[in-house]
Amino acid sequence: VEAFLGSWKLQKSHNFDEYMKNLDVSLAQRKVATTVKPKTIISLDGDVITIKTESTFKSTNIQFKLAEEFDETTADNRTTKTTVKLENGKLVQTQRWDGKETTLVRELQDGKLILTCTMGDVVCTREYVREQ
């Protein structure tokens, strides 16, 4: 987990609007969300991980222990049962709600944080660079 710690700024995004459509995010929310460049801050206190996402649109904050299910309220106001696991050096976050499921995988590639979001057959990638 230590390699993920720090502050990350969104640099580029691919297929985010399609991904949000699959989540049933409203057109107005999608328009705003695709224009902002959020910052993600990942920290660790003992065995509790915090992932804070900050933007001018909406900020979220989740705290969890690896492999323990918790209740999450997402940026688009879904209430999910969420689990985060460390698998092959990747942080794999699974959100479940209303019989649906989406997966958010965070991994490090060439010093960048790559977030791959999958919902059904739609895959979105978001690339973050470490802030100094």
Swiss-Prot record:
InterPro entries: Calycin (IPR012674), Fatty_acid-bd (IPR000463), ILBP (IPR031259), Lipocln_cytosolic_FA-bd_dom (IPR000566). It comes from the Eukaryota. Coiled coil: none annotated. One of its GO terms (molecular function) is lipid binding. Keywords: Acetylation, Cytoplasm, Lipid-binding, Phosphoprotein, Transport. The modification Phosphotyrosine is found at residue 19. GO terms for cellular component: cytoplasm. The modification N-acetylvaline is found at residue 1. Pfam families: Lipocalin. It is found in: Cytoplasm. Forms a beta-barrel structure that accommodates hydrophobic ligands in its interior. FABPs are thought to play a role in the intracellular transport of long-chain fatty acids and their acyl-CoA esters. Belongs to the calycin superfamily. Fatty-acid binding protein (FABP) family. This is Fatty acid-binding protein, liver. It comes from Ginglymostoma cirratum (Nurse shark).
